[in-house]
Amino acid sequence: MIQAPRIAIIAGEASGDHLGAGLIQQLRLHFATAEFIGIGGDMMRSAGCQTWFDTSELAVMGLTEVLRHLPRLLKIRREFCKRALAWHPDVLIGIDAPDFNLTVERWFKQRHIRTVHYVSPSIWAWREKRAAKIGASVDRVLCLFPMEPPIYARYGIDARFVGHPMADEIPYQTDRATARTALGLPLLSPVLAVLPGSRHSEISQLGNTFLEAAGQLSEHLPGLHVVIPAANTQCKPLLAEQLSRSTLPVMHSHLLDSSARTAMLAADVVLVASGTATLEAMLLKRPMVVAYKVAPLTYRIVKTLKLLKINRFALPNILAGEDLVPELIQKDCTAPALCAALLDCFKHPQKVTALQNRYLQLHTQLRRNASTRAAEAIAELLQQR
């Protein structure tokens, strides 16, 4: 029985640093004298992990940026693997960032070191056969969604549903009034939150259409306030430029620095790009309209090659197995269509109440004390040695 395991953790993104810190805290309840090294950020360091590289050094997005930084990323991977192997870890845990982590995990597994991948890639959405490659890299997968372990089971891979950390963080009942006060919004006016994505390409595709829809909505809802949280500093100039050309009343439109959760909390309804933000809006119990649009050539390739295996895109709909919220994709993503769907949310409170009850059921399903369950699954794996 291992009393003081050596645990290596790699968090390739800021969200992974957050997950890693919670995991370390829970693992210490199982192994008080455990040692932790890895790649992480401030939160993992505060939890007691000695980081050899910072998470920010791995955080690159987009093909061109990855290619530009590839020599540096390969050097980090090479140096980490060599140094970590010499440290003799009992287990290596990769958190999300599959492009980097799965290769490292496989390298360690081939050297008979236990490996765990925390946060499954979206194999339920596309390229399910990746599960076999993941299984060749890890001894156990820790999944955030309940539909994931059955897919891995078809490939004979040990996968555990641990719940979603965001469902643990967000309370079942949320406080709209406090959020509005924090943002300086009137308590009784209608409020729409607009989230067209976190990447430049997403905002280029969706931003103008979203703002046009919000402008049309304001004609139906006098006094409507629109809050637009910029996901990061890189996005804000583009959003500001799009907002300046929109028909939204200047006094009632609010471009924010980040604050996405506060913006959604303050809102009556959310207009959001398909992605993780839809899950957050669901957990905050906000009715939403979900939209997405990619370049026409990309969409044709995906459809022709049948790369996607889902017919729903919004996470609330995928989790529910039914159409809880409107989805407007590609040619259906027009300002009039978005405006009509948003207006329906504002005008039918009885529908909103039923929707929020369904949200609560899904929230309960996802709230599992993820860090605790993840630590238990890793501790169990360590005791099998």
Swiss-Prot record:
SUPFAM superfamilies: UDP-Glycosyltransferase/glycogen phosphorylase
UniProt keyword Lipid metabolism, yes or no: yes
One Gene Ontology MF term: phospholipid binding
Pathway: Bacterial outer membrane biogenesis; LPS lipid A biosynthesis
GO biological process, one term: lipid A biosynthetic process
InterPro entries tied to this protein: Glyco_trans_19
Catalytic reaction list: a lipid X + a UDP-2-N,3-O-bis[(3R)-3-hydroxyacyl]-alpha-D-glucosamine = a lipid A disaccharide + UDP + H(+)
Secretion signal, residue range per the UniProt entry: none
Superkingdom, taxonomy of origin: Bacteria
Any one GO CC term of the record: membrane
EC number: 2.4.1.182
One Pfam short name: LpxB
Keywords recorded for this protein, A-Z: Glycosyltransferase, Lipid A biosynthesis, Lipid biosynthesis, Lipid metabolism, Transferase
Function: Condensation of UDP-2,3-diacylglucosamine and 2,3-diacylglucosamine-1-phosphate to form lipid A disaccharide, a precursor of lipid A, a phosphorylated glycolipid that anchors the lipopolysaccharide to the outer membrane of the cell.
Record-linked PANTHER family: LIPID-A-DISACCHARIDE SYNTHASE, LIPID-A-DISACCHARIDE SYNTHASE, MITOCHONDRIAL-RELATED
Entry's family note: Belongs to the LpxB family.
Protein name: Lipid-A-disaccharide synthase
Organism: Xylella fastidiosa (strain Temecula1 / ATCC 700964)
Gene name per UniProt: lpxB
